[in-house]
Amino acid sequence: MIMKVFNTLTRQKEEFKPLVAGKVSMYVCGPTVYNYIHIGNARSVIAFDTIRRYFEYRGYDVKYVSNFTDVDDKMINEARKEHTTVGELADRYIKAFMEDTEALNIEPATLHPRATHEIQEIIDFVQDLIDKGFAYEVDGDVYYRAKKFPNYGQLSDQNIAELEEGASEHINEEEQSKKEDPIDFALWKAQKDDDEIAWDSPWGKGRPGWHIECSVMSTKYLGDTIDIHGGGQDLEFPHHENEIAQSEAKTGKKFVNYWMHNGFVTVGKKQEKMSKSLHNFVTVHDILKQIDPQVLRFYMSSVQYRRPINYSEDGLKQAETVLKRYQNTLRNLDARLMDEQETLEDSILRDNLTQAKAEFIEAMDDDFNVQNALSIMYDLTSNLNTHLQKNQVDKPALKKAKKLLLAWLEIFGVSFNEKQTENDDEIEVMVAKRDEARKNKNWAESDRLRDELQAKGIVIEDTPQGTRWHRA
C-alpha cells in the first residue's frame, strides 16, 4: 500500500518516500521550557508521537529528534520574575515536561537536544551565513537577509510584498534602524543587560535567535535533508519559514521533504485557540490531577492531526466510554481464551479480521486518518463482542484479534496492562465462595460477598461461562 502525507509546502497529499528505505528521520519542534505545557502544546506532542508509532507499526526505523528551547526572551523574563537563573528554570520545566509526557505515554525522542548545549555549532552556522552573504552584523546583532533567499514565503504561501507590509506594522524603531529590510530576522542577539544570559561570539556577547536553534539541531542530528519536520500550525510562519531560509542557504540542499503541521486545540463555544496569551489554557500538569492520563491521550489522538480539536468535558467523557469498551472487550476475550469450551472455526470472524486490518492500514496510510481507523477498530470490537456470546468460539481467531487490537491501541498510546496485586489471591477466594453460594442458592451470602467485593473496588460479571471480575 502507498502511504500518503499532506505536505504543507505543496498544499497536497504526496506519496511518502523516505530518504533511506525502511528509515524515517523526524524533527519536531519542542517546547520553550519556561512553564508547564498546556493542552494546546500537548496536541503537537501527542499527534507526532502517534505518527511516529504508526511508522514503527509499519516496520520503519524512526529517528525522532525534538528539541528544548532553553534560552529566549520568555525564559529570561520568567527567570527574572522568579528570581532564579535561566538554567535552573529550564531544568525545572524540562523535568516537568518529561513527567507530563511520560504520564501521557509519549515515547521519549531518540534525542532531546537543548539549544544552550549547541552554542558553538550555532555560532559556526551563523558565521557561515555571514560568509555566504545571507547575513549581516549590526552592533552585535546578526540578521538574516530574507530577500536574498529566492523562495522566502513559499511555505506559508506569502509573497515578499505581503510579508514586508506585515513586518512594517510590528517593527520597533531600534530594529528599523538596524535592519536592511523589515522582514529580516535575528540570528544572534547582543546582550542588553549585564545580568542577561550570554555567550562570547565573534560579534560580542549575546545569545542565539529562536529560529537558528532548530536549523542547527536538526541538521546536526539528522543531516542536511530530513524526511519530516513537524510542529503546530502557528509555527508555519515565521519559525519554519525562517528555518528553511537559514538551512538551505547554508547547505545548498533541500532542507525538508515533508512539512507537517498539526491543528490547534480550541475551547468554548467560540472555539478560540487555546493559548497563554488569551489566558484560556489548562496545563497538562493540572488536568492530570483530575482525569486518567490515558483518557486525555486517547481524546487528543481521536481527531486527524491537521484538524482542530475542541477541548470539552463531553469529549473526555466520550473518550473514557470508548476506552472502557475496548478494555471490556479485551477482558471478555481473555476470559473466553481461558475457558474450557472447545474451539470452533468461524470463517466470518476470520474474514472480518483480515478485512479490518487492511482497512485500518488503508485509513492510516491516508495522511494518518485516525477517525476512519478508530471507526474500524470500533466495528471490529462489535463483531468480537457478538462472537464472544456464542457457546463455542474460534480461539485461534480470538488470539489474532487480541494481538491486532493491542497493536492498534499501542499506536494511540493506550495500554491496558493490569498489574497483579498482592490481594488478587484473596479476591479469587471470595469470588469462588460467592460462586459456591450461588450454586447452593444461598442468595443472602452471595449478595453479601458481592457487596464486600464492590467495597474493595471489584466489579463482578456473571456470564454463562462463569463469574468474571476486574477492578473498577
Swiss-Prot record:
A motif ('HIGH' region) lies at residues 31-41. One of its GO terms (cellular component) is cytosol. It catalyses: tRNA(Cys) + L-cysteine + ATP = L-cysteinyl-tRNA(Cys) + AMP + diphosphate. GO terms for molecular function: ATP binding; cysteine-tRNA ligase activity; zinc ion binding. Coiled coil: none annotated. A motif ('KMSKS' region) lies at residues 273-277. CDD domains: CysRS_core. Keywords: Aminoacyl-tRNA synthetase, ATP-binding, Cytoplasm, Ligase, Metal-binding, Nucleotide-binding, Protein biosynthesis, Zinc. Zn(2+) binds at C29, C214, H239, E243. Belongs to the class-I aminoacyl-tRNA synthetase family. PANTHER family: CYSTEINE--TRNA LIGASE, CYTOPLASMIC (PTHR10890:SF3), CYSTEINYL-TRNA SYNTHETASE (PTHR10890). Monomer. This is Cysteine--tRNA ligase. The lineage of its organism: Bacteria, Bacillati, Bacillota, Bacilli, Lactobacillales. The gene is cysS.
